[in-house]
Amino acid sequence: MGLCQSAEDKELTLKSKAIDKEMMANHMSQAKVVKLLLLGAGECGKSTVLKQMRILHDHGFTAEESEQQKSVVFNNTLQAMISILKGMESLRMTFDKPIRENDAKFVMEAHKMLQEAKVFPEELANALQALYSDKGIQTVMAKGNEFQMPESAPHFLGSLDRIKLPDYTPTEQDILLSRIKTTGIVEVKFQMKSVDFRVFDVGGQRSERKKWIHCFEDVNAIIFIAAISEYDQVLFEDETTNRMIESMRLFESICNSRWFINTSMILFLNKKDLFAEKIKRTSIKSAFPDYKGAQTYDESCRYIEEKFDGLNANPEKTIYMHQTCATDTDQVQMILDSVIDMIIQANLQGCGLY
């Protein structure tokens, strides 16, 4: 009788196998959904990285979305010149041609012209182009780190011949460089290598940060983006605080947060193209007075990497670092592919499936 399995035992065995099967199915399901959180201080390039993910993995932007971006490009173009004119005033600099004062006054009062505009107003475009060609304005733009000049200013102001055309449609590069403040949470979904990705971008300004941690403790990885080029710039919302130092403080708080102890941490040192140009003129000593190295890209970048790495209080946690240019689609694709492979592998290992 002891050799015979009772009906009750058989039923328990079948139930156990069913539970095991269900648990494995749940593991497989979890392994096939990866949540990524993009974090970083304001204007570091998070939204640009998210747009690149859409271009590379989510069929880009529809014709309707591109059309909607026109108003953003129009406003960014106008705001670029307004910020330069304000910078000119704060730096107490002047136009090369005094007649440009009339154009400046017109531009400063032109907001209403762009409301509901389907085509960039010709009169406004002419005024902006006249100002942009003025040597005084070009001199002010060369000092853009001393005031809040948008990094996209040269692109949009230099593209007015194209932007003012009646049939203008924003290019992918226009959309990548366009900026609107992120408030709340923006999500992009895509599939890669049979894995579903959900990527979240949240507001980077200080006022938005309280929304971060409690919502995202279950993410698989954090991509933290720091603008490496902003070592000599101050915050938009606090002009006494260095942007690089603020970014490092934020990175330290996220990296060592109890909510993210087991979360993979990936650091994008972004805007490396701007950093490469700026380092020729200005040393990183403006942010790091103790820096003793040469004023070169490689040494300066290595020092900043070491600074960020030193903020990690967990010796068992690896920070995966990449130098990036978020507006370069080819480079972003190569880095994202590498990052995503690493995340998929780590996720499968975490579920016991690798």
From Swiss-Prot:
Assigned keywords, A-Z: GTP-binding, Lipoprotein, Magnesium, Metal-binding, Myristate, Nucleotide-binding, Palmitate, Transducer
An annotated GO BP: adenylate cyclase-modulating G protein-coupled receptor signaling pathway
The keyword GTP-binding belongs to this UniProt entry's keyword annotation: yes
Segments forming domain G-alpha: 32-354
Binding site for Mg(2+): S47, T182
InterPro entries with a match to the protein in the record: Gprotein_alpha_I (IPR001408), Gprotein_alpha_su (IPR001019), GproteinA_insert (IPR011025), P-loop_NTPase (IPR027417)
Region described as G5 motif: 324-329
Gene Ontology CC: cytoplasm; heterotrimeric G-protein complex
Region listing for G3 motif, in residue ranges: 197-206
Lipid attachment, kind N-myristoyl glycine: G2
SUPFAM superfamilies referenced in this protein's UniProt entry, alphabetically: P-loop containing nucleoside triphosphate hydrolases, Transducin (alpha subunit), insertion domain
Family statement drawn from the similarity comment of this UniProt entry: Belongs to the G-alpha family. G(q) subfamily.
Subunit record text: G proteins are composed of 3 units; alpha, beta and gamma. The alpha chain contains the guanine nucleotide binding site.
Protein name, as recorded: Guanine nucleotide-binding protein alpha-3 subunit
Source organism: Caenorhabditis briggsae
Gene that encodes it: gpa-3
